[in-house]
Amino acid sequence: MSVPAFIDISEEDQAAELRAYLKSKGAELSEENSEGGLHVDLAQIIEACDVCLKEDDKDVESVMNSVVSLLLILEPDKQEALIESLCEKLVKFREGERPSLRLQLLSNLFHGMDKNTPVRYTVYCSLIKVAASCGAIQYIPTELDQVRKWISDWKLTTEKKHTLLRLLYEALVDCKKSDAASKVMVELLGSYTEDNASQARVDAHRCIVRALKDPNAFLFDHLLTLKPVKFLEGELIHDLLTIFVSAKLASYVKFYQNNKDFIDSLGLLHEQNMAKMRLLTFMGMAVENKEISFDTMQQELQIGADDVEAFVIDAVRTKMVYCKIDQTQRKVVVSHSTHRTFGKQQWQQLYDTLNAWKQNLNKVKNSLLSLSDT
């Protein structure tokens, strides 16, 4: 991608024009180019560029795109420090003012660089920070498949990979993109190994709390397989997660009674937890029983007789359970329920179902063939 230049002249003259422009705006900068070469000129120009960020947007974008175009023609070994310096300026400029302009400038730099250049990591992290500060994360690429490819292309160290994913997660959370944020956090936790899983305690803890707090999240068994989460076994947060994975409402109530302060410290609301555990308990009941009496529901879900119908309607809205109410016989008839966990037993059931379909299709095929022969 080509980046617009400040003016169509040689690099040396362009640097001199930039120096003169910045000096005219009050920068303490010589108009004469440095004897050290273009990279030294750019270092001094970037250091002084704050003054032009106060000007009209068109002037600023033109000037800064000129800086970007000069950066892009430097040798890679001279680019990194200068790009880091420019990114720091754009991220920290005047406590978040003019975010759309800063996003545009960073985007021009990011897309103007060679796709495999490792320093694109710095620019992308800066893009995330600025986008998060103004709630504009939707305007930068955050698709997980693309991020994975960049991590590979840029040959990031484990530490930088974790930093990027953590930064992206926090930005998505701040911008209320909870589904995307959850996927990024699972990606982050899944990137740890047995050797370094203990370093991810904070991330694992945060992932669990975020998942339990999400009003649209109901399946949590995949979290138990993540190494950093396994490292939390024996702690209250892991016990709580296990309850939400497979236990019933009564288990949660008992846990809450014994650990009320802990639940409160997580920022989780007890009533929201109760509502979610009622649904999860009902899902488990619906998997095992195709008909559930109102009395059983009242007992297991700890609700009154007048609340059963409203509860079922809300449960169906989540699409976790499909059922209908039989008012006459005071029962719920289940047509389908999502399994809370998907282990060996569920895989076997799926295999048996698919195998039965295959056999039935073969029978139909053979019947059709026999008809065509007659």
Curated annotation (Swiss-Prot):
**SS bond list:** none
Give the record's GO biological process terms. formation of cytoplasmic translation initiation complex; translation
Residue span(s) of domain PCI: 180-339
- One matching Pfam family, short form? PCI
Under Gene Ontology molecular function, one entry of this record is: translation initiation factor binding
> What SMART domains does this protein's entry cite?
PINT
Task: Return the PANTHER family for the record.
Answer: COP9 SIGNALOSOME COMPLEX SUBUNIT 7/DENDRITIC CELL PROTEIN GA17, EUKARYOTIC TRANSLATION INITIATION FACTOR 3 SUBUNIT M
Protein family per UniProt? Belongs to the eIF-3 subunit M family.
* Record protein name field: Eukaryotic translation initiation factor 3 subunit M
Organism for this UniProt entry: Mus musculus
